[in-house]
């Protein structure tokens, strides 16, 4: 790969020389930082198995190299990269994979290590959604995830990625993460805090990432990280697992933050060593059992991951000063719930007891049952998935519900050709040679749901959301 010029402040280089173990070469560190980052993807096992995905893309000639810490993760090389961006492939558009940097798959691998099966998980700094969607896949879309994002502009992107991947067990919030220890004390089985950081590990992706770097800013960021970790630790139930991670390399934002928590809460904090997380993990292992991944070790972004267990309860934090307000939804039960369920099943939308029906005026929603005990304690930006809007003639089923719940082998499923699927993504009506028999059509491609539509005469009326419609060259090569 070609080298690219990375800006390194002198003080940063001095700090890295001090932080790097003697077993690693500083020259190799500089060389690795100058190389462009390898592309990588994670297969979305909520929609397709790894084996089936590999068989599906075999004709494309993509070269996939397994990522050792993530069974469904692969580094990818493509000869057709310039002709067709990875994000415009049919498999990406239908949510079969997520474009995710390899090292950022590490925190979720650590969260679920040692056969850990949490039912209620918080992703405290969730956008753009790579780790939230990875958590959802590991949970099999069961239980519940509270995905929080402090940046308002990034919440929309987070929701879009969750929807594309067909995830139904998630609630979104928009808070400073420091509120959760007080607002939701000891409510979570597992918490991921992928903390905001100085981003020293991302120079392979952004050569100018260190333009505004300074030792003083590292210390300021570390102070915020300690407050976030303190909040997360209070929100974790006794016996629960917390993973703290960053994409930076200095010890102040990494080891020192975790050691501060141990010093503060002593025996309530147990560090869980990560040396057995995957083959060769010991190459990045610190004396404390953390993973401090310098970019030359595994040829990926720089990263830090620590895993710990909460051994006992803590005194409660002061109660939050905000009011949540009245919850605008009511549970849908009895005959009404049965009617909605039967109508949804008739068009191929299926769910189980993990999701419960709720209603707000004419809107019908599905909430993960595991999140319901948090209602009234925190304000949600979005909870579960919107299933339908009721009207005089029945229900208008929502796109995100179709992607998450539709059964592609249902009697109303209608498989499109590649050209027809591309027309669908462009927002155009479909004129199949042999129209479907049913009026309500579950449109699929590669046996994946693309949406619910109406057959009108010989055409299928496009229902793809306008905000998702794609322009330019897509997977058939036509513009």
UniProtKB/Swiss-Prot annotation:
Its EC number is 2.1.1.178. One of its GO terms (biological process) is rRNA base methylation. Disulfide bonds: none annotated. The active site is at 247 (nucleophile). It is an enzyme of class 2 (transferase). It holds the Pfam family Methyltr_RsmB-F. Keywords: Cytoplasm, Methyltransferase, RNA-binding, rRNA processing, S-adenosyl-L-methionine, Transferase. GO terms for molecular function: RNA binding; rRNA (cytosine-C5-)-methyltransferase activity. Its main location: cytoplasm. It is found in: Cytoplasm. One of its GO terms (cellular component) is cytoplasm. S-adenosyl-L-methionine binds at residues 125-131, 149, 176, 194. It catalyses: cytidine(1407) in 16S rRNA + S-adenosyl-L-methionine = 5-methylcytidine(1407) in 16S rRNA + S-adenosyl-L-homocysteine + H(+). Belongs to the class I-like SAM-binding methyltransferase superfamily. RsmB/NOP family. Specifically methylates the cytosine at position 1407 (m5C1407) of 16S rRNA. This is Ribosomal RNA small subunit methyltransferase F.
């Amino acid at each position: 790969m070609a080298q690219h010029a990375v800006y390194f402040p002198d003080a940063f280089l001095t700090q890295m020389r001090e932080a790097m173990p003697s077993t690693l070469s500083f020259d190799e560190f500089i060389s690795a930082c100058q190389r462009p980052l390898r592309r990588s993807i994670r297969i979305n096992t909520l929609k397709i198995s790894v084996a089936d995905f590999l068989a599906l893309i075999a004709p494309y000639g993509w070269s996939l190299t397994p990522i050792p810490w993530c069974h469904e993760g692969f580094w990818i090389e493509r000869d057709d990269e310039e002709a067709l961006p990875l994000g415009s492939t049919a498999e990406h558009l239908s949510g079969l994979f997520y474009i995710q940097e390899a090292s950022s798959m590490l925190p979720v691998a650590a969260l679920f290590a040692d056969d850990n099966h949490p039912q209620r998980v918080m992703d405290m700094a969730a956008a753009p959604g790579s780790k939230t969607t990875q958590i959802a896949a590991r949970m099999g879309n069961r239980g519940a995830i509270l995905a929080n994002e402090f940046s308002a502009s990034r919440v929309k992107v987070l929701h879009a990625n969750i929807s594309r991947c067909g995830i139904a067990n998630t609630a979104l919030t928009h808070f400073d993460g420091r509120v959760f220890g007080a607002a939701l004390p000891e409510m979570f089985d597992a918490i991921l805090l992928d903390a905001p950081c100085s981003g020293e590990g991302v120079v392979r992706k952004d050569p100018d990432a260190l333009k505004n770097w300074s030792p003083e800013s590292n210390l300021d960021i570390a102070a915020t990280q300690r407050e976030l970790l303190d909040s997360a630790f209070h929100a974790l139930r006794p016996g629960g697992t917390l993973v703290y991670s960053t994409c930076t390399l200095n010890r102040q934002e990494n080891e020192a933050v975790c050691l501060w928590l141990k010093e503060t809460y002593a025996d309530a904090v147990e560090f869980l060593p990560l040396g057995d997380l995957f083959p060769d993990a010991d190459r990045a292992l610190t004396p404390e059992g953390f993973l401090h991944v310098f970019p030359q070790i595994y040829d990926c972004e720089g990263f830090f991951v620590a895993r710990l267990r909460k051994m006992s309860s803590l005194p409660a934090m002061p109660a939050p000063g905000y009011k949540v307000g009245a919850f605008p939804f009511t549970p849908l039960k009895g005959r009404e719930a049965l009617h909605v369920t039967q109508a949804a099943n008739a068009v191929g939308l299926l769910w189980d007891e993990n999701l419960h029906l709720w209603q707000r005026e004419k809107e019908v929603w599905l909430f993960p049952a595991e999140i319901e005990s948090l209602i009234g304690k925190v304000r949600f930006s979005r909870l579960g998935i919107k299933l339908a809007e009721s009207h005089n003639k029945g229900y208008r089923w929502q796109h995100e519900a179709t992607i998450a719940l539709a059964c592609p082998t249902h009697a109303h499923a209608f498989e499109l050709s590649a050209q027809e699927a591309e027309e669908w993504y462009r927002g155009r009506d479909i004129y199949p040679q042999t129209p479907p028999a049913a009026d309500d059509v579950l449109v699929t491609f590669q046996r994946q749901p693309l949406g619910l539509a109406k057959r009108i005469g010989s055409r299928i009326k496009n229902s793809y959301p306008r905000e998702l419609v794609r322009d330019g060259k897509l997977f058939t090569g036509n513009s």
